[in-house]
Amino acid sequence: MAASSNSSLSGSSVSSDAEEYQPPIWKSYLYQLQQEAPRPKRIICPREVENRPKYYGREFHGIISREQADELLGGVEGAYILRESQRQPGCYTLALRFGNQTLNYRLFHDGKHFVGEKRFESIHDLVTDGLITLYIETKAAEYISKMTTNPIYEHIGYATLLREKVSRRLSRSKNEPRKTNVTHEEHTAVEKISSLVRRAALTHNDNHFNYEKTHNFKVHTFRGPHWCEYCANFMWGLIAQGVRCSDCGLNVHKQCSKHVPNDCQPDLKRIKKVYCCDLTTLVKAHNTQRPMVVDICIREIEARGLKSEGLYRVSGFTEHIEDVKMAFDRDGEKADISANVYPDINIITGALKLYFRDLPIPVITYDTYSKFIDAAKISNADERLEAVHEVLMLLPPAHYETLRYLMIHLKKVTMNEKDNFMNAENLGIVFGPTLMRPPEDSTLTTLHDMRYQKLIVQILIENEDVLF
């Protein structure tokens, strides 16, 4: 009887006029059915029942048979009692009258009452929600099964809004596009690898700027009437009527959530901090190509720290690095990390490394980790480079763009090796475990893979001009 509010869409009439936005017609059929659903009628026991559980009220009738319960309900729709099982003492049953029959449900209590997934504060709420669900699923089973077939989601404006934001982002990114024209120096570098790798490495792929993000749906209890923003149908029940995206606030039926496109546009008000936030979620929320932390820190480092000895290898004071982290979490892009506030450049490099370490999903994602490790194990240099490039193409767009930008920066660091003593191998040692972590939290795996992590970052830095 767990009232599952999984639903979908039946035919909706939507204006075809693309030039003028028309609000969707919210469908009232399921709302009307909820209003018509039988109301719970508690059948009170006229006597005091010994050993009645403290969390049950006078609807508890003690140890009685199914036949006695049926007689007490008297054929009244929505009537209910609680009883203790004759066959299994200590087990409790909800007897409920619906559809001209008595339905019996095993009843549980763990601080809240439940017969399925939903937890209720009171038996009255449990029965009310159950009657609504039974009534709607009995009266509208076919209607519910067809709800997702003709969604109004596109017409509400989410997809249009997304396309506009992507267009604006693309227009801004024209100042820093992926490389499509090969200079003489790049041509010389490309000759180092096979023609197959060269063709793949220099292929322009606009999809990397079309950042897709899945919605982060979680079961939600809506206070007051709510309608699904995918199918436009009412979200029935008292609690857990549907799901809400915790990043953008989209409200839909659980069933409809399976059909929503990966077009989450996070709301800044819902993003509590910068550090420890999913990379794609952060860039979508701020409508940027890369996390602001990466851009701001790298600009500061390149402005005053490229010649600093041991750059990225030397650690800054932990307390000051935490201060930078808090500044970004508090002030966002307005965080002041200038030399006036943090004269030691190692604090800024430490803050950048900390950002990468704190990512829930590393820059080199868990999904691609083993593929990168396998690529690093290839002995032939050309084949290894080709394999690395193929795996790069599997990274989510925001992760790819962040990695690309970081590698361009680290290449600049190596160009100042005579001053900072940091070559690609040294940077690989620093950034290998920072940018890529094994999916399983195994110390043995981490230690075994460290040399391959280092090698991958080293390859990315040394071949930045042909891999990205």
Swiss-Prot record:
Gene it is expressed from: CHN2
One MF term in the entry's GO annotations: GTPase activator activity
Keywords, sorted A to Z: GTPase activation, Membrane, Metal-binding, SH2 domain, Zinc, Zinc-finger
A Pfam family the protein falls into: RhoGAP
Domain (SH2) ranges: 59-127
Record GO biological process: acrosome assembly; regulation of small GTPase mediated signal transduction; signal transduction
Membrane topology according to the record: Peripheral membrane protein
Known regulation of activity: In the inactive state, the N terminus protrudes into the active site of the Rho-GAP domain, sterically blocking Rac binding. Phospholipid binding to the Phorbol-ester/DAG-type zinc-finger/C1 domain triggers the cooperative dissociation of these interactions, allowing the N-terminus to move out of the active site and thereby activating the enzyme.
Domain Rho-GAP residue range list: 277-468
Listed name of the protein: Beta-chimaerin
Tissue: Highest levels in the brain and pancreas. Also expressed in the heart, placenta, and weakly in the kidney and liver. Expression is much reduced in the malignant gliomas, compared to normal brain or low-grade astrocytomas.
Signal peptide: none
Zinc finger motifs (Phorbol-ester/DAG-type), residue ranges: 214-264
Sites annotated Arginine finger: 313
Function: GTPase-activating protein for p21-rac. Insufficient expression of beta-2 chimaerin is expected to lead to higher Rac activity and could therefore play a role in the progression from low-grade to high-grade tumors.
Cellular localisation: Membrane
